[in-house]
Amino acid sequence: MTDLESELAESGWAVVDLPNPAPVLRARDHLLASLRRAMPDLADLDSYHAMVDDSRHVETLFELANEFWSARLGPAIIGENLDFFRRLVGPDLYVQRQPYLRCVRPGRPEDAAPLHRDTYYGASPYEVSVLAPFTAMPAEGAIRAIRGSHLEPDAAYPFRQLPAAEGAIGSPRHRLGYPYAPRLLDPALQARAEPVPVGVGQAMIFGLSLVHGGGVNDGTRTRFSADIRIVNALAPVRLGRGVDPQYFVPLCLSPVSRSAQRYLAANEAASDGACR
């Protein structure tokens, strides 16, 4: 077992240097250029909070996310490090079609996701999240996680269900990755959560049964990152989720899977022809 495999198995996450950080840097530059069209004086992504007020934040971020999705900047991070992720997850990979673009301003609890477990929201423990920052995430502004929680039963983490706000389903905030009916864990768990610093060109990789959360950004600079989910195409997962029937899309298939799909398609075509 490699060090990476051991860390994932025991802790529930690992921070790695991406073999090819170029798509992360390219995405960062693309996002900054997009924001500068409306904010020409924006020095860098870290300074975003000084340029956008609360009344415009969600709208601005949603517009930026749509550009991020249209340019397929998130899947490119996986695709241009494909050998690494195929060794980790398998040769048959699906990738999230619209990865989450995260923006957490300093001192804004409404921007950050509290501690949560994604399997409580319909995700599968077979899924892997790749958190790739576009700005440095030092300890004071980092995501937090509970070591070993990915192996514990749901009974160890009871939650309190909040009602869905009217009009929240399918809203820009919902599509940005904020739950419309949050399932809140015990706030006392924060004492067990540790910060996970991640630099630009690195990625935090974790399974979705891990208890984690952004928490309040206690730093002085805005935290921008991509949260890209990938899954083995042969794992028992739903490819659609919530308001998105194409939540996962194919990224790559092994030669065996390609041959199998052609065989199955040929049989289906022959069966359809016989029925006419």
Descriptions of predicted regions:
Residues 82-146, 151:
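Conserved double-stranded beta-helix
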Residues 70-72, 188-192, 215:
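Active-site rim elements
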Residues 5-7, 119-124, 134-136, 195-197, ...:
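A general structural signal for short secondary-structure junctions and capping/turn motifs
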Residues 13, 96-98, 125-131, 140, ...:
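Extracellular structured ligand-interaction cores
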Residues 127-172, 245-275:
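Conserved, charge-rich beta-strand/loop surface module that forms ligand/interface-binding patches
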Residues 140-210:
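Double-stranded beta-helix
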Residues 1-94, 195-199, 266-276:
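N-terminal auxiliary "cap/dimerization" subdomain that precedes the catalytic jelly-roll/cupin core
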Residues 35, 210-276:
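Non-heme Fe(II)/2-oxoglutarate
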